[in-house]
A protein has these predicted regions:
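C-terminal motif of bacterial Sec signal peptides marking the signal peptidase cleavage site
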Residues: 15-17
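Hydrophobic alpha-helical targeting segments used for export or membrane insertion
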Residues: 8-12
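Bacterial N-terminal signal peptides that target proteins for export
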Residues: 1-7
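Residues within mature, well-folded domains
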Residues: 19-204
């Protein structure tokens, strides 16, 4: 065999030998739950977690279809496949850490406050439950209840969940803050951004 053919055959054999099979992510094809209310306008969203568009309620059972280097594609009944990309918080969290947050193995509905026997207290608890389901927050709610209602604040703006203030994006260029005293919400303040200060011109 000519030397050129031998070299080509050797190169091909080496390429085949070096190509490793793709190993699926451990979460691929698993069923999980949404930690919180998630929103989308298009089937591609990011951890910017804009609070607008179609709602996927917290506690929705989802199937994880595919996990890539910095994104996950999942499917909830009645919704198209959604690709969620870890973008802004990538310096603070690994993708696996982020997935553990947003897609827990257990239904978060079990963490909703239970209705007490007292009628007045039951009315207050029921109001809180409805606000969580509607994705709204009020003074007196706990950090865990805020997470269920709004989702996790983008990690680039709120690196630690122990912080006294969490910052969210209602939409691109429109932020608001949740302030806490201890474990409870003490204030909700809206902070529209100055003109031209929107988030990098991309939608999440």
């Amino acid at each position: 065999m000519p030397r050129a053919h031998l070299a080509a055959a050797a190169a091909l054999a080496l390429a085949v030998a070096c190509k490793e099979p793709t190993v699926p992510h451990p979460l691929a094809n698993q069923f999980r739950y949404t930690c919180c209310n998630l929103h989308y306008e298009k089937p591609e969203i990011t951890d910017a977690n804009y609070l607008r568009g179609t709602l996927i309620p917290f506690g929705t059972r989802i199937q994880i279809l595919e996990v890539r280097k910095d994104s996950v594609t999942f499917k909830a009944a009645g919704h198209p496949p959604i690709t969620l990309t870890l973008r802004d918080g990538a310096r603070s969290l690994t993708l696996d850490q982020y997935l553990d947050r947003v897609f827990p193995p257990d239904d978060p509905y079990a963490r909703l406050p239970k209705l007490p026997p007292d009628g007045k207290q039951a009315a207050e608890v029921d109001k809180t439950r409805r606000m969580i389901e509607e994705g709204t927050v009020s003074v007196g709610m706990t950090r865990d209840q805020v997470l269920m209602a709004l989702g996790y604040p983008p990690a680039d703006r709120t690196p630690s969940l122990d912080a006294s203030t969490w910052r969210y994006w209602a939409s691109r260029g429109d932020t608001f803050e949740i302030s806490f005293e201890g474990d409870q919400v003490s204030r909700v303040s809206r902070q529209p951004a100055a003109p031209g200060s929107g988030r990098r011109g991309r939608r999440g």
